[in-house]
Amino acid sequence: MAEITKFGASEVAFHIKHDLREIPEGKSYGNEAINKEQSCNNYSLLNGRCQTAEEANKYRKELEKEIFKYNRKNLVHAVEVVVQCPVDCPLEQKEDFFRVSYDHICSTLPMGERCVFVAQVHVDERVKDQAGNIILDSHGNPLSKDHLHVMYVPGVPDTKHDGFKYKLCADQLTKRARLKEFHP
């Protein structure tokens, strides 16, 4: 139901573009289940903030200036949580499901909603069987894999470094015990 991925500095921009469906013309999303005609129905939960990949990446970089970072090559600059909507969720409750999921994720982050730079609901991906065929529901409509992408800067409280309230530390936010609190 939920998946967590960590990204280094060089990976973040591409994944923001993927989540916001801003892959350049002629390039592939790497996911053939995406129905591009339905991509216009995807929506953000950020209330006007970070609506383009450029805005989101700029916001992330500005926020990182306020956060202590160790000088490491393998430093995690972003964490993404993908929350899948249950198949049995009634259509009229999907928006509420994603909003409650987003609010819960933000409530577990030391920096709260401020560190989130992508919160995008995808309704444009279809379910395929193992042979690669799109699965249809009882009415002949393609089954949808609606899900929420939340990307955030993994800032945690910092008491060691003067001038910084937070430091980058994805490990503190993605430990097994902490993940079990999110989804036992």
Where are these regions (language model features)?
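N-terminal nicking endonuclease/strand-transfer module with a His-rich metal-binding environment
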Residues: M1-P184
